[in-house]
């Protein structure tokens, strides 16, 4: 058994936990290897680029917040990922710092359970081939620095859904429904729901609302504008700039993310404690 370890190197507490984890793994006779930048900060010679880490380990440990987990998941392929929260919100990271050793031990013993999460795949035709990008949370196309309001034309399975005049469009998974989409007015969707949500950003129409669709639908998006460049972001990372009328196709990826589940963690409780769901002002609930 060998673990691939990814650290949010900007957090000193994450580095401290990584050192404790290494000592514990060595005492157990368990192998490990760090992502390159993490290895540099921790002072370890055992490292590999994040793109190669999944070929050299059996499972991943993410030490950081939700952003670190998203980064790790993009490269984990089908390997299980243990998310240890050393961040601010920790909505996706299943385990607290105090639960780290117990969680890792369950993976070593093979007594863990998995939460399987759907990913989005965004593809853009370029130079005779398709550029493809994956996202666990969301794919976002924005107007960027374009000074006017462009129209985002959306088709579902080749049929026109609508043309949205807005600052951008968010395509989110059920996992990503509590991220950018929620901030833009989208609904909260239970994690195992087989749906996507299309959420416009600041639409210039009172009648426009987010729409929930089957995750079997193929979504095509293009930006109608006379000029300009429009950012295509996947899980908060800029992937490329789009030209007017350049088509982006978004669909369910065949690659799933396997997150090691915390059996003591209830999704409804997470909504209440992390997002203060349903909490009244001055309520003790």
From Swiss-Prot:
Catalytic activity reported: NAD(+) + ATP = ADP + NADP(+) + H(+)
Subcellular location: Cytoplasm
Active site location: 66 (proton acceptor)
Gene Ontology cellular component annotations, sorted alphabetically: cytoplasm
Listed cofactors: a divalent metal cation
Keyword set includes Cell wall biogenesis/degradation: no
Gene Ontology BP terms: NAD metabolic process; NADP biosynthetic process
Coiled coil: none
Keyword terms: ATP-binding, Cytoplasm, Kinase, NAD, NADP, Nucleotide-binding, Transferase
Family per similarity comment: Belongs to the NAD kinase family.
Protein's recorded name: NAD kinase
């Amino acid at each position: 058994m060998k673990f691939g370890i990814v650290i949010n190197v900007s957090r000193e507490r994450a580095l401290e936990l990584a050192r404790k984890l290494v000592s514990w793994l060595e005492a157990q006779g368990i192998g490990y290897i760090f992502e390159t930048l993490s290895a540099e900060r921790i002072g370890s010679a055992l490292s590999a680029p994040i793109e190669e880490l999944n070929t050299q380990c059996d499972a991943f440990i993410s030490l950081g917040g939700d952003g670190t987990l998203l980064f790790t998941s993009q490269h984990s392929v089908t390997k299980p990922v243990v998310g240890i929260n050393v961040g601010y919100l920790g909505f996706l990271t299943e385990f607290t710092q105090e639960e780290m050793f117990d969680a890792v031990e369950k993976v070593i013993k093979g007594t863990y359970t998995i939460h399987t999460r759907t990913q989005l795949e965004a593809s853009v035709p370029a130079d005779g081939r398709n550029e493809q990008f994956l996202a666990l949370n969301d794919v976002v196309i924005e107007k960027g620095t374009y000074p006017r309001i462009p129209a985002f034309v959306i088709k579902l399975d080749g049929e026109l859904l609508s043309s949205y005049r807005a600052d951008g469009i968010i395509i989110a998974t059920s996992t990503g429904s509590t991220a950018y989409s929620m901030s833009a007015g989208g609904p909260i969707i239970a994690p195992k729901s087989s749906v996507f949500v299309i959420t416009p950003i600041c639409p210039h129409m009172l009648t426009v609302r987010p729409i929930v669709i089957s995750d079997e639908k193929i979504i095509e998006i293009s930006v109608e504008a006379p000029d300009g460049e429009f950012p295509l972001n996947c899980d908060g990372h800029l992937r490329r700039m789009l030209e007017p009328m350049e088509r982006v196709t978004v669909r369910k990826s065949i690659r799933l993310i396997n997150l090691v589940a915390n059996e003591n963690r209830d999704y409804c409780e997470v909504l209440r404690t992390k997002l203060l769901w349903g909490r009244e002002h001055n309520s003790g609930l």
